[in-house]
């Protein structure tokens, strides 16, 4: 009980909620973001160490969103009102409406619990134990160390989180790409290219 009371007093948890909020807000402006129970250290000390990994995940999600969004949008726009277009519309609506956390759980159920092909949790700590972390990016640090096993392990652990975070942006990019391509394919210069006898593949790549 004495230790509990001491901890409550240290973190102002023995005071009313509005007073706790005031202390928290004041701490934010002073650079004190609180205490991390997971890392057992101040958040201000943990944050810089985790920032690189967070940026790595965000960048990976952006790459996934761009690749899938542009690919799906182009494929659907070139096949207007056909099955690929309808499937892309469903994906776009799902991406715009499904919460990320729910979609992430769905991916875990399918690819980890049922199929067993996707890992969960952190990258294997044993692979990274002897690797220096000059950048803090697991994939980059593994490559710099010449440890391909660690590199692929990091990539493998990034796949599901990157898809989960990038799904919403994928839907938006796919819809924008589809709309832009459909509009371009209705232009006169595209009709002229088709009239010249160019293959649809060439029309899409060079003229649309």
Residue ranges, per PLM feature:
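Hydrophobic alpha-helical transmembrane segments
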Residues: 2-12, 103-113, 160-162, 205-208
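An internal, D/E-rich "acidic patch" concept
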Residues: 13-70
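Hydrophobic alpha-helical transmembrane segments of membrane transport/permease proteins
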Residues: 1-22, 111-150
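Cytoplasmic-entry segments and transmembrane alpha-helices of multi-pass inner-membrane transporters
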Residues: 71-107
């Amino acid at each position: 009980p004495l230790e509990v009371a001491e901890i409550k007093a240290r973190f102002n948890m023995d005071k009313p909620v509005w007073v706790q909020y005031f202390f928290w807000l004041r701490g934010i402006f002073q650079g004190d973001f609180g205490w991390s129970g997971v890392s057992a250290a101040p958040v201000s000390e943990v944050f810089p160490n985790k920032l690189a990994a967070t940026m790595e995940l965000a960048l990976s999600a952006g790459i996934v969103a761009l690749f899938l969004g542009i690919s799906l949008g182009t494929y659907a726009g070139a096949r207007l009102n056909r099955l690929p277009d309808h499937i892309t519309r469903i994906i776009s609506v799902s991406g715009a409406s499904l919460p990320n956390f729910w979609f992430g759980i769905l991916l875990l159920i399918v690819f980890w619990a049922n199929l067993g092909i996707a890992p969960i949790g952190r990258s294997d700590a044993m692979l990274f134990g002897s690797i220096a972390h000059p950048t803090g990016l697991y994939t980059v640090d593994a490559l710099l160390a010449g440890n391909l096993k660690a590199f692929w392990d990091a990539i493998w652990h990034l796949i599901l989180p990157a898809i989960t975070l990038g799904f919403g942006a994928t839907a938006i990019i796919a819809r924008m790409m589809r709309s832009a391509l459909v509009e371009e394919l209705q232009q006169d210069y595209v009709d002229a290219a088709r009239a010249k006898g160019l293959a649809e593949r060439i029309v899409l790549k060079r003229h649309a």
